[in-house]
């Protein structure tokens, strides 16, 4: 059985940024110098600390994991065999994922966007029909349910978002989300809350043991 570990948090703006910066590695602090947006700096720091927590609690004690960038710029785990990572942040929400197979995670909260136009461009006919059947007030969250699945799946496949969003579709008519077509190689998990949606994907044909935990920001 494949193990998949997820930690996520909702930011607390009352907590000072320095609280999170103090726990970063020298490499993280060096990468952080490229950011100017305060909210981006904050979410970057929190995502790296969540990942640190996952690595420390889930990997063998003797493991010496390191982060590296692939040729495409994707963040990857080095120094340990058979483990994969994914990060997501936005709208004050941050999530980190560690899995024994290629993985992707996305967490999204409500925000102003032209979601109908995005759906018309990236959603399949079946997805658009399902979206149209939802109550008007439920439209934004229904959109996020599909969008987060697409983002998580594309990340798990290691492909570019823009070029592959429209090439995959999902069925949300059942109890659990399913990828339409050839879906045997991907396991999906989605959690829907009043103020956000979290979706995760793992590239495997085996059953997945999901470990999902919300960590209060003041415990990071």
Stretch-by-stretch model annotation:
Residues 1-220:
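Core catalytic alpha/beta fold that binds nucleotide/phospho-ligands
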